[in-house]
From Swiss-Prot:
Residues 599-612 have a biased composition (Basic and acidic residues). The modification Phosphothreonine is found at residue 30. PROSITE patterns: RAPGAP. InterPro entries: Rap/Ran-GAP_sf (IPR035974), Rap/Ran_GAP_dom (IPR000331), Rap1_Ran_GAP (IPR050989). The keyword Cytoplasm applies. Residues 617-629, 660-669 have a biased composition (Low complexity). The gene is Rap1gap2. It comes from the Eukaryota. It comes from Mus musculus. This is Rap1 GTPase-activating protein 2. Residues 566-594, 641-652, 681-694 have a biased composition (Polar residues). GO terms for molecular function: GTPase activator activity. Signal peptide: none annotated. One of its GO terms (cellular component) is neuron projection. Its main location: cytoplasm.
Amino acid sequence: MLAGLKVKKQELANSSDVTLPDRPLSPPLTAPPTMKSAEFFEMLEKMQGIKLEEQRPGPQKNKDDYIPYPSIDEVVEKGGPYPLIILPQFGGYWIEDPENVGTPTSLGSSVYEEEEEDSLSPNTFGYKLECRGEARAYRRHFLGKDHLNFYCTGSSLGNLILSIKCEEAEGMEYLRIILRSKLKTVHERIPLAGLSKLPSVPQIAKAFCDDAVGLKFNPVLYPKASQMIVSYDEHDVNNTFKFGVIYQKARQTLEEELFGNNEESPAFKEFLDLLGDTITLQDFKGFRGGLDVTHGQTGVESVYTTFRDREIMFHVSTKLPFTDGDTQQLQRKRHIGNDIVAIIFQEENTPFVPDMIASNFLHAYIVVQADNPGTETPSYKVSVTAREDVPAFGPPLPSPPVFQKGAEFREFLLTKLTNAENACCKSDKFAKLEDRTRAALLDNLHDELHTHTQVMLGMGPEEDKFENGGHGGFLESFKRAIRVRSHSMETMVGSQRKLHGGNLPGSLSGGIVHNSMEVTKTTFSPPVAAATAKNQSRSPIKRRSGLFPRLHSGSEGQGDSRTRCDSASSTPKTPDGGHSSQEIKSETSSNPSSPEICPNKEKPFIKLKENGRANISRSSSSTSSFSSTAGEGEAMEECDSGSSQPSTTSPFKQEVFAYSPSPSSESPSLGAAATPIIMSRSPTDAKSRNSPRSNLKFRFDKLSHASSSAGH
């Protein structure tokens, strides 16, 4: 296939002697499908041919392979008058012919669209700036008006953004559409006459992109989407320009001679005054065009102007720094050589060749030659040249292309310069850069619109990933596994609660006590008077560090709300096989410490000390004391937080928080209120159920109940 493409390319090269006026016009933006397919295959063949030539070195191109144009030296030797521009020996450029009306210009090209008439100021001479119509179409026709936006993910053409709007003009209804893809942006207005119903969004996209498949559009549901879309559409709209200005003296035909000029003739100064204002670069606040405005390393002065809300900075060769001994004058060429369009000012009749200046960026030149300089009515001849892949641009040159000095010539020149740069951006080299930039920005816009739409719908990124079949890697898989395990545990806990009447075996819940038939709840309610008296002076209590650590610190005299749990003593073995238990108390009803339950509680406490036994609060049955200054609900919260601690923190016991829905028969002071209880399990309970200490604790509890009953 590559060989066939090579042969076809050679045939096209042999027939490349077609003159410039015979070049066909560019097809309209909405060309028939057959023409679109032909253009696509032609572009594909061209790209494959270029890749083949790049991969295969081949012999260098010689002069014998071409029909060369006469060199500039030969033209100069023949004598004048000389043309303003002559083509390079091996071509590659076109020259605008003002006498041939068939010369294509951007006025008849689909690449550009002129600005609307109302955008021109009343003082203009009819010269119109050209720009991409689709770049400003959304702001002009959609922004602030009723319309719909859609985005398409993963089509054969990549991501797509479509805007659609119904409008009426001259008694007819139209459908205005903007379709954005990585390749291009299409803006069209379709009449609805003869259509029974509106076409669907995929049908509209299919009409503009015949080879598109997998079209699945979603509506954009984000209030600020219009601003994001208009920013994307206008990302390549430029309101700042920089142009080079090169001074060419008589019979200068080399690049070194052009950049080596330092003197400015009166005619050249007069022309610079026509272009703009001479400004001082130091601390200049306007568009600087890459010039140094702080340290003065790019000269002292330059020429600057504003034109139709656009800023223009001119890189004048004679005002840029001159370096002695540097024949190439890189300080000057590094600015002018990086411009896209340049002006060549000729004071005398001398030809200019576009390849005279070696640059990868310069694509178009406007040559201005002074006619009758120094007179009261000077005039200027103008000629335009550009590379072959640059589309023609307006305004067209008049015939003859001669202008009198004045505002009209200035406006024509600035308009021509601006349109020239816009046209050069459509050349092959710049178009590739623009395509890559457009594709990256379109993908970013699509992702942002999709994300904001999902947020507006209440779908987070996690749900969105699950909906689209995505996954979040190892971390998301681990989270899902934990959620499944937690759900399984909750299911087991629920089934055991139904089976055992509300409580669970400790083997399932990691420390939950046995059912209520195996537990004896020991509760007490000391007299209110005694509790109030003891509230001011509390006995020192040593707190254990176990499953329920001390969460609050501070002096006991502070009045801030604290949540603690009052734990009762453990009970001996009962016929039901119950274990020791603790009960949550509220200080609003009582605030006792475990050793100070009743007036007679000090005696057994002293006896324990005399017998050399440890404090009850530190006994093996893990009888502990907590004081509470908040309500019962806060005590429950602290117990919940404590129960989340690992059960291995205390090697002597295992405690969990349990909620008793029915009042305990042994707790008359609480009435019908629900009793949250902290259950204590000790590994030594089985060994010490009949121990003297357990019997002593049992007698101590009976004494506490007797005192409580006497109080009532």
